[in-house]
């Protein structure tokens, strides 16, 4: 069967609070810090000029949740030479760690004992924010040890100049030792935008790969529907 992944809101739509390319240079003057906002941390940057338009607690540590997967994407793309043809085995043991965690899933478990291409797993991770796809990629690149993958994530964060970021897992599940800042996330995302297919994948609303058919609907309460 074929699998269709559909999302009504992009996984990365939340990044509008930290990245903005719509501001022209003429209108790039910083806004006053008394602007009313709901988010705890904000960094709004003109991507054309690199000028900060507005910021609020941009260096305070926050839990990144699913935006963690931006770094997971970076490590995956930099360590898999052929995204379209590399086949990655799906192991039940890797997926079992997500049970009872309330994880968002991409139905990867339907492929246990089989393989999926790296590109299908990247779409499965980024479009419906599939923690299962993130774990499979991390296990593969970490050669059977997800901790090896997480080490690569932290090394990359330092390389990118992140000063208040530490990753504890590849999927973003809550951990007191798993944090970043709006400024660091801006650095990570800016770098990700230079990598192959990142912008293409994160702008995708529907993706079809060889798997079971289901429809994924996202709203504020994050519900999943399979059919």
Label the model's feature ranges.
Residues 2-6:
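Bacterial Sec-dependent N-terminal signal peptides
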